[in-house]
Amino acid sequence: MTSHSTSAQCSASDSACRISSEQISQVRPKLQLLKILHAAGAQGEVFTMKEVMHYLGQYIMVKQLYDQQEQHMVYCGGDLLGDLLGCQSFSVKDPSPLYDMLRKNLVTSASINTDAAQTLALAQDHTMDFPSQDRLKHGATEYSNPRKRTEEEDTHTLPTSRHKCRDSRADEDLIEHLSQDETSRLDLDFEEWDVAGLPWWFLGNLRNNCIPKSNGSTDLQTNQDIGTAIVSDTTDDLWFLNETVSEQLGVGIKVEAANSEQTSEVGKTSNKKTVEVGKDDDLEDSRSLSDDTDVELTSEDEWQCTECKKFNSPSKRYCFRCWALRKDWYSDCSKLTHSLSTSNITAIPEKKDNEGIDVPDCRRTISAPVVRPKDGYLKEEKPRFDPCNSVGFLDLAHSSESQEIISSAREQTDIFSEQKAETESMEDFQNVLKPCSLCEKRPRDGNIIHGKTSHLTTCFHCARRLKKSGASCPACKKEIQLVIKVFIA
């Protein structure tokens, strides 16, 4: 009988362990919390952690318990949620009262099944330890021999009492083990839900699960003690509450389609609106404040500016302070140094013997100008305009007529440049008036900033959605650093 009881208890404990391993992720809320979940549209009595958090958020939204101005504040006084929390209000930035309530009102379904299995096993042991009705009848027929009955009772009582002591110790160990497993299991469910991504109404980790994670996020983390929670400001992230589900799905699908369609148009839009800057230049600009201004990062490879005497990183070709070009930059390239060091042609001094000689009345040719870099030549073309350099053959006898021709040509070029600038500005203005390139509904008021350039191609909602999803700029495929809203007056 003792061996049968032990085997029954082992089988019951094995089934309890098997049930607990299968149903770890399910929780069962208590009655008061279950009423709140049912009021928010939940069905059933067993949920996952994500479902519990979802319906709690739906309850807060339906009842409009949050403040319209400061939407991270939830006022639950006089409501079922306030009675359950035991407070009048709480902030989303410090959700510790909410987590304490969930710990008290959530029970893992696995622990319920294991308790049932344990109760069944203890009941079997209890029925086996006490005599049955047949055994009592058999004892009544043998009552005539009291000594024999006493000896049999002693022989049965001794192993049974030992078995009871051993079973009671095993039961205490099992209950203690189950309580520890239940607590760790609930903590694990909270932590797994917390890492998976939070809605707007719950921020931060559990106080007992505050473990620093190096996930590359920009959230500021303080001391990870028991009273500390990871908090990020999402008070302006309620814009999606006013949008329908179909609109959100439509925008998400159009973002993927627009990324594939606009790859062929990147060259056209970038040539019209922005000057193409290399990726290395943007990286240098973003790291300039951290790399160049640190006094402790001195090395033998740094070069000193000849203008302001500042030490700069060896990878920089311009001085960070005065923006002067580094001396002997790429000195091995003869063409580049020649173009940068080319000076104006110095006039040949006339001999004193030639003074007083009349200039002949004839035509003469002027030598070809020295080839200069394209940018520098265009900049010096207007302020240093010389009639002798712009005309191939000059009639020295008719200088007044040539000057009139040159002045008329200058006026025509100025008029042409002004017309070209006006047409470009009109094209840019018409592009701004077009709707968003992703949703094609809202105006283009979301300015996508990356480095020292930005693009105004989407609305503010779509631009912020791209920033949150980690997508790149739809115009130039660069990483989005900041999104601002533009108001066109």
UniProtKB/Swiss-Prot annotation:
Keywords attached to this entry:
Metal-binding, Nucleus, Phosphoprotein, Ubl conjugation, Zinc, Zinc-finger
- What domain of life does the native source organism fall in? Eukaryota
Modified residue annotations for Phosphoserine: S179, S341, S367
Query: Domain description from the entry?
Result: Region I is sufficient for binding TP53 and inhibiting its G1 arrest and apoptosis functions. It also binds TP73. Region II contains most of a central acidic region and a putative C4-type zinc finger. The RING finger domain which coordinates two molecules of zinc mediates the heterooligomerization with MDM2.
Question: Where does the motif Nuclear localization signal lie?
Answer: 441-444
A Pfam match is: Zn_ribbon_RanBP
The organism encoding this protein is Mus musculus (Mouse)
Gene for this chain: Mdm4
Disordered as annotated region, ranges: 131-166
Q: How does it assemble?
A: Found in a trimeric complex with USP2, MDM2 and MDM4. Interacts with USP2. Interacts (phosphorylated) with YWHAG; negatively regulates MDM4 activity toward TP53. Interacts with MDM2, TP53 and TP73.
Ranges where the SWIB/MDM2 domain occurs: 25-108
Q: What is this protein called?
A: Protein Mdm4
Any GO BP annotation: heart valve development
Q: What does this protein do?
A: Inhibits p53/TP53- and TP73/p73-mediated cell cycle arrest and apoptosis by binding its transcriptional activation domain. Inhibits degradation of MDM2. Can reverse MDM2-targeted degradation of TP53 while maintaining suppression of TP53 transactivation and apoptotic functions. The short isoform is a more potent inhibitor of TP53 activity than the long isoform.
Q: Which InterPro entries match?
A: MDM4, p53_neg-reg_MDM_2/4, SWIB_MDM2_dom_sf, SWIB_MDM2_domain, Znf_RanBP2, Znf_RanBP2_sf, Znf_RING, Znf_RING/FYVE/PHD
In terms of SUPFAM superfamilies, this protein maps to:
Ran binding protein zinc finger-like, SWIB/MDM2 domain
Q: Is the Ribonucleoprotein keyword given for this protein?
A: no
Q: Name one GO cellular component term.
A: nucleus
Q: Where are the annotated segments for Region II? A: 246-331
Tell me which CDD domains the record gives: MDM4, mRING-HC-C2H2C4_MDM4
UniProt family annotation: Belongs to the MDM2/MDM4 family.
